[in-house]
């Protein structure tokens, strides 16, 4: 089992939801012990679906979430057996921001060579950015998406603001002054107790991909 493999490799804060879907109750329990969770679900379609479902549940209770990339291996057990605990630790350090993970997965459903499909993708990004009610946070994520997907920042900002004004959802973003770049905050001395690896013990009958 994945959680056992993680503990044997020295990742003592690994926990599992024991084959059930992650619930708000699970999230509230995790919140008692940590403010940050690293998701390490299986890398197949079922695992991606589980991660996408878990992210908003964890966010609702105030937990910051990152997603560990285990490819080309399916799960933590396979990964550690093949590459070892040290490499897994490196994957933890490079874990993907949960919002950027959601955007990357969403992109797979669009044809980026087709102008109409590409525009639809940008509109969906803007809708998701509206989920950030604090202006500074929304601006930071707008910048991050702009860089990652080569979308002109001002164009994306205007699109988000337009949707916000039409929906009466949030205050529009202010335009950034030219020549000023936000620096990424680096994790500094994070205590191990603030990190948890959440692994999904998938029910084989429901989620195992057909061979």
Locate predicted features.
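Acidic, divalent-metal-coordinating active-site segment for phosphoryl/phosphodiester hydrolysis
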Residues: 2-4
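Gly-rich Lys/Arg/Thr-decorated short loops/hinges at beta-loop-alpha junctions or inter-strand turns
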Residues: 7-10, 106
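Short hydrophobic/aromatic-enriched beta-strand-loop microsegments
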Residues: 12-19
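A charged alpha-helical hairpin associated with nucleic-acid processing machineries
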Residues: 21-37, 41-209
């Amino acid at each position: 089992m994945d959680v056992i493999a993680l503990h044997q490799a020295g990742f003592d804060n690994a926990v599992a939801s024991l084959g059930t879907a992650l619930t708000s109750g699970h999230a509230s329990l995790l919140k008692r012990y940590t403010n940050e969770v690293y998701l390490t679900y299986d890398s197949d379609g079922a695992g991606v679906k589980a991660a996408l479902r878990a992210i908003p549940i964890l966010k609702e209770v105030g937990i910051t979430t990152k997603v560990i990339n285990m490819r080309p291996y399916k799960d933590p057990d396979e990964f550690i057996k093949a590459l070892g605990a040290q490499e897994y630790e490196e994957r933890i350090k490079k874990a993907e921001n949960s919002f950027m993970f959601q955007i990357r997965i969403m992109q797979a459903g669009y044809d980026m060579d087709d102008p109409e499909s590409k525009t639809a993708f940008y509109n969906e990004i803007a809708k998701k950015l509206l989920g950030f009610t604090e202006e500074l946070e929304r601006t930071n994520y707008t910048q991050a998406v702009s860089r990652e997907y080569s979308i002109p920042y001002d164009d994306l900002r205007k699109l988000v603001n337009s949707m916000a004004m039409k929906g009466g959802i949030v205050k529009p973003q202010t335009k950034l002054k030219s020549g000023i770049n936000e620096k990424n905050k680096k994790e500094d001395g994070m205590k191990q107790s603030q990190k948890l690896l959440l692994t999904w013990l998938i029910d084989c009958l429901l989620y195992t991909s057909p061979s």
